[in-house]
């Protein structure tokens, strides 16, 4: 399928175009092809929802398309509006099947598209639900600094770590030693009552299993509390 054919088909079916930009030497690209793209659930969702193209960024018209859409790392997943031929959602990196399907779902929700999220963040949008979407997106593309900065802003804006949606975002996206981990440890009984001992212990155990020795020793009391 050529680019022109994909655009025409996407317009006719009123679908976005999905492009998997890869290279022959890209290890994560091969891993995604073998372990994620080949799964029936993933294939069914993407085939039903998008016009799909797998494009070698270093061969043929892939060179032009990669340059046009600013592809600098591999794999890059680009979702294109066929009417304008502009990219509306971008993702990347190795993802689990669940993450990859969610990436596709987000592409079809205008308020969860990467370009919308970045535009709104730049304009100063710091609404709670928006920040959580922003955090989840940047976690999915391994932009850890953006995740941490946005989570800090979420808390500074009045959200509490004990709020269910904030706790979920913390568990899923914030890693390593930080003040939030200490807050969980210092208020262990309260967090266990709210979210269950198993979930709290799992988070503490995960985050204290690596890091600088001095940091781990500083949080030694956590280990006394955890029994999993």
Describe the residue ranges of each PLM region.
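Loop/turn elements at helix/coil->beta-strand transitions in domains of secreted/extracellular proteins
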Residues: 13-17, 48-51, 74, 82-86
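Short, solvent-exposed loop/turn and secondary-structure capping segments
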Residues: 29-33, 65-66, 89-92
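CheY-like receiver
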Residues: 99-103, 113-132
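Oxidative protein folding and maturation machinery
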Residues: 121-228
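Non-catalytic, surface beta->alpha helical segment in thiol-disulfide oxidoreductase systems
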Residues: 71-115
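A short beta-strand-turn-helix
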Residues: 1-16, 46
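Thiol-based oxidoreductase modules, predominantly thioredoxin-like and allied folds used
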Residues: 1, 21-23, 32-62, 71, ...
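Short active-site neighborhood of thiol/selenol oxidoreductases, capturing the structured segment around
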Residues: 12-26
